[in-house]
Amino acid sequence: MKSRAAVAFAPGKPLEIVEIDVAPPKKGEVLIKVTHTGVCHTDAFTLSGDDPEGVFPVVLGHEGAGVVVEVGEGVTSVKPGDHVIPLYTAECGECEFCRSGKTNLCVAVRETQGKGLMPDGTTRFSYNGQPLYHYMGCSTFSEYTVVAEVSLAKINPEANHEHVCLLGCGVTTGIGAVHNTAKVQPDDSVAVFGLGAIGLAVVQGARQAKAGRIIAIDTNPKKFDLARRFGATDCINPNDYDKPIKDVLLDINKWGIDHTFECIGNVNVMRAALESAHRGWGQSVIIGVAGSGQEISTRPFQLVTGRVWKGSAFGGVKGRSQLPGMVEDAMKGDIDLEPFVTHTMSLDEINDAFDLMHEGKSIRTVIRY
């Protein structure tokens, strides 16, 4: 079938809106009509060429919502007409990782997904006979996409796709990191480095967890009003100080902050976040994705004296079994999604959405099909 899509033909180049061919779903696969998709920093990261797993030409997009059109052989968990959110972190329920009960990092389709392919090692997309790669198992920058059954969360059909599509990545990642990775407790102190969608979601999650002091940190003060709306008690612009942000936080509490979250992908900020964590029990959670080849460092004494460095992917959330409940929470107002959507656009305007993001003028732009 034909589908309009925004295709990245080469790194560092604007996306091109073209009509592509989408092949039918094979065994264990599902064809979806995408209704909405967010434009995320991870898409921009891959488009920049810095992503070690980036392959081109590719249909990007991984933060979407849509409706099932057709199912392949053996698919039982969804049927045509079901409303779904594609998952870049699958949940098969059968692999060693799923059965461990310790992680959400299912490996059922990981090997082929990282190569831009479907589980059988081929692609369902082509343009003028040339194969196009899939992206993160989702490829929501196409009006129609094919996704593995294990990479789909079935959601309430009454949910507003313009909002709940954000649960496909950023908001779930931030809120989940608070509850599942850090396990923030009432009255704990929290510092959030970077107030993009993920950082703001961390702030909201910290409020849900009834954290005491919630410190929001960003060099763009225009984001502070929204941070306060989501629950920040303090907003700090590092550029307002003539000393490192770590020292600013240690002035607030000489022993440090209970939980710090790095939501940028800057290895220097990752170190500052770790060294701002509370002596004896503080933990720092890395959520931001750093560029290819970059490494983190700190003095071992920082860990010897009780600090813990952690990472979080998709907020530790198991997509098929847990994400539908987060959609219900959003429908009840327990998760506030609407303020994240600062712009809505058509697919033809998608390059403008990337410009807004790079200029710091948007939190999330949602593309409507």
Swiss-Prot record:
Biological processes, Gene Ontology terms: formaldehyde catabolic process
Subcellular location: Cytoplasm
PROSITE patterns, A to Z: ADH_ZINC
Catalytic activity: S-(hydroxymethyl)glutathione + NADP(+) = S-formylglutathione + NADPH + H(+); S-(hydroxymethyl)glutathione + NAD(+) = S-formylglutathione + NADH + H(+); a primary alcohol + NAD(+) = an aldehyde + NADH + H(+); a secondary alcohol + NAD(+) = a ketone + NADH + H(+)
Keyword annotations: Cytoplasm, Metal-binding, NAD, Oxidoreductase, Zinc
Signal peptide (residue range): none
GO molecular function: alcohol dehydrogenase (NAD+) activity; S-(hydroxymethyl)glutathione dehydrogenase (NAD+) activity; S-(hydroxymethyl)glutathione dehydrogenase (NADP+) activity; S-nitrosoglutathione reductase (NADH) activity; zinc ion binding
UniProt GO cellular component terms: cytosol
SUPFAM superfamilies attached to this UniProt entry: GroES-like, NAD(P)-binding Rossmann-fold domains
SMART domains: PKS_ER
Essential cofactor(s): Zn(2+)
Transmembrane segments: none
List of residues binding Zn(2+) 1: C40, H62, C169
Positions with a binding annotation for Zn(2+) 2: C92, C95, C98, C106
Documented EC number(s): 1.1.1.284, 1.1.1.1, 1.1.1.-
Family stated for the protein in its record: Belongs to the zinc-containing alcohol dehydrogenase family. Class-III subfamily.
Subunit record text: Homodimer.
PANTHER family noted in UniProt: ALCOHOL DEHYDROGENASE (PTHR43880), ALCOHOL DEHYDROGENASE CLASS-3 (PTHR43880:SF12)
Function text: Has high formaldehyde dehydrogenase activity in the presence of glutathione and catalyzes the oxidation of normal alcohols in a reaction that is not GSH-dependent. In addition, hemithiolacetals other than those formed from GSH, including omega-thiol fatty acids, also are substrates. Also acts as a S-nitroso-glutathione reductase by catalyzing the NADH-dependent reduction of S-nitrosoglutathione.
Designated name of the protein: S-(hydroxymethyl)glutathione dehydrogenase
Species annotation: Escherichia coli (strain SMS-3-5 / SECEC)
Lineage: Bacteria, Pseudomonadati, Pseudomonadota, Gammaproteobacteria, Enterobacterales
